[in-house]
């Protein structure tokens, strides 16, 4: 049976909610951001029949995947192994971190560059690596901002959505050497890009999440907008991907409908800037790509949810974040009030 990370018993939801509700500026920021994201999603789904049809198709695919989960996970491991990917199974956060740490120590890694991964937040990956003397550096711009601030993400898609432009400007001026205060958004992005490019060049390992695993072909699908995911998975000599066991699909043809739902619902885009399909490490004769690819499949209570007929439906989630964007409670108090990795009522 999995060891499940408990909700932080010292976290006071009522007190944290009260603090946010007593801050008019923060309430205004949350409300404005949620209104903006809702409008972008509506613009993508003008035709309600199309929306309902796509949602039903996506639901059918996810229900089918979960109904066949044990078989698909076995097939995924077989195909990935044949492709040269090393597959690891982790029952708990401690086990997942131990696997990653073992890989890092074997290759004498000192620096890990990270793409966006909520599962890495779920297991406390950064703290585990830092405790072992290994730097874990976020490369997603939002994650980089909250890491600089010493905070957790407040939204599963937009980690720093609770930060104002002025707060980010002050954070960069205080925490990034040689940077002066500026509220120019393009300048702030350029500063972040310059720092991150150096980190990519110095990294020994790249860590990423996975949006979907395709069992039939042994493929890891990763969607993103900044290009940092592609850099994390191709520049370092070792790539470690980590995801929950529920993310498996049977066929490649199941990916496009779910990616369409994900991107249009999450950020109001027809498709993300980058769609990465990873099916193994660098082959002989190839000039780029990692020499090793590892996949850590995390349980952490998912098999318990799978065994419960009612809870099993929660495993269909594709992590688009639209429920948070439309939640009247979240829009008023944000994600930090909950004290959990995946916030919301």
PLM ranges: what are they?
Residues 193, 198-281, 286:
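Conserved phosphate- and dinucleotide-binding cores of soluble alpha/beta proteins
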């Amino acid at each position: 049976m999995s060891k499940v990370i408990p909700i932080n018993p010292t976290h006071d939801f009522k007190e944290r909610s009260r603090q946010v509700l007593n801050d008019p500026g923060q309430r205004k920021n949350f409300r404005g951001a949620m209104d903006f994201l809702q409008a972008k999603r509506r613009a993508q789904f003008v035709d309600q029949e199309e929306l309902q049809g796509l949602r039903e198709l996506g639901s059918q695919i996810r229900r089918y995947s979960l109904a066949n989960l044990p078989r698909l996970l076995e097939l995924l491991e077989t195909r990935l192994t044949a492709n040269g990917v090393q597959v690891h199974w982790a029952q708990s956060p401690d086990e997942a971190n131990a696997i990653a740490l073992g890989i890092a120590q074997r290759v004498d890694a000192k620096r890990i560059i990270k793409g966006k991964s909520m599962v890495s937040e779920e297991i406390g990956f950064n703290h585990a690596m830092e405790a072992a003397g290994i730097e874990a550096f976020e490369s997603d711009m939002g994650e980089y901002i909250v890491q600089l601030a010493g905070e957790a993400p407040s939204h599963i898609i937009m980690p720093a959505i609770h930060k104002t432009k002025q707060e980010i400007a002050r954070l960069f001026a205080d925490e990034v050497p040689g940077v002066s205060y500026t509220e120019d958004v393009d300048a702030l992005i350029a500063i972040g890009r310059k720092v991150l490019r150096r980190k990519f060049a110095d990294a020994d390992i790249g860590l990423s999440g996975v949006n979907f695993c395709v069992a039939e072909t042994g493929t890891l699908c990763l969607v993103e907008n900044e290009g940092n995911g592609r850099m994390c998975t191709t520049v370092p000599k070792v790539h470690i991907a980590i995801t929950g066991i529920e993310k498996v699909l049977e066929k490649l043809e199941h990916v496009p409908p779910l990616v369409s739902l994900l991107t249009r619902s999450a950020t109001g885009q027809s498709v993300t800037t980058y769609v990465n399909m990873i099916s193994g490490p660098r082959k002989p004769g190839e000039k780029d790509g990692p020499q090793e690819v590892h996949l850590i499949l995390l349980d952490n209570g998912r098999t318990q949810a799978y065994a419960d007929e009612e809870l099993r439906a929660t495993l269909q989630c594709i992590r688009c974040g639209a429920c948070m964007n439309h939640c009247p409670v979240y829009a008023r108090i944000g994600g930090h009030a909950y004290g959990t990795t995946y916030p919301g009522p």
